[in-house]
Structures are given as structure tokens and as C-alpha cells.
Amino acid sequence: MSSYKYYDLIRKPIITEKTTTLSEQNKYAFYVDKFAEKLTVKKAIEEIFKVKVKKVNILNVKGKKKRFKGIIGTQINRKKAIVTLEKDHNIDFAGGIK
């Protein structure tokens, strides 16, 4: 699989207080494509960030129900991947920010 398809597979990193504490344990969270599988997520992270992945956990996050001007709708369903890296590897999302 070429690298441009890997960039389509990984939507965006999840940067919250909870995922920041997970990053201390070498775990990073990403929103991924809804058809993504563990093996393809592992290959994509290794190709994009040049790191060694130890384990991948995938969760389906159901969209919340919201009300807008009296009309009830739902947010989109998402798929979240929590990637565990090997000991000597890490991903720096904030690198270069001054």
C-alpha cells in the first residue's frame, strides 16, 4: 500500500488530557477511517511516523444525540485507534511549535 493511502487511513490524532497522560505510557490515540483494521493501522503508523508499533486497540465510538433548533440529530460514528509503541519510540505532535 502506498503512503498516500496511509495518510487517508489516519484521520487525526486525539489530543486531550486523557490521551496526554496515556502518552507517558507510550500509547497514542488517533481517529481512523471507519473501515480500518488493526494490521493496516499498524502499518500506517509505522510508515508515517517511522516508529515501531507494539500493539493496536480499536474502538467504535457511537455518535451522541444532539438537539439543534428543536430537531434531534446525531453526530457521526467514529473509530478510534489506541496505538502502543515499543519502549524506545515516541511520537512528538507538538514538535516545532514555538
UniProtKB/Swiss-Prot annotation:
One of its GO terms (biological process) is translation. The keyword DNA-binding does not apply. Keywords: Ribonucleoprotein, Ribosomal protein, RNA-binding, rRNA-binding. InterPro entries: Nucleotide-bd_a/b_plait_sf, Ribosomal_uL23-like, Ribosomal_uL23/eL15/eS24_sf. Gene3D superfamilies: 3.30.70.330. SUPFAM superfamilies: Ribosomal proteins S24e, L23 and L15e. One of its GO terms (molecular function) is rRNA binding. The keyword rRNA-binding applies. One of its GO terms (cellular component) is ribosome. One of the early assembly proteins it binds 23S rRNA. One of the proteins that surrounds the polypeptide exit tunnel on the outside of the ribosome. Forms the main docking site for trigger factor binding to the ribosome. Part of the 50S ribosomal subunit. Contacts protein L29, and trigger factor when it is bound to the ribosome. Belongs to the universal ribosomal protein uL23 family. PANTHER family: 60S RIBOSOMAL PROTEIN L23A (PTHR11620). This is Large ribosomal subunit protein uL23. The gene is rplW.
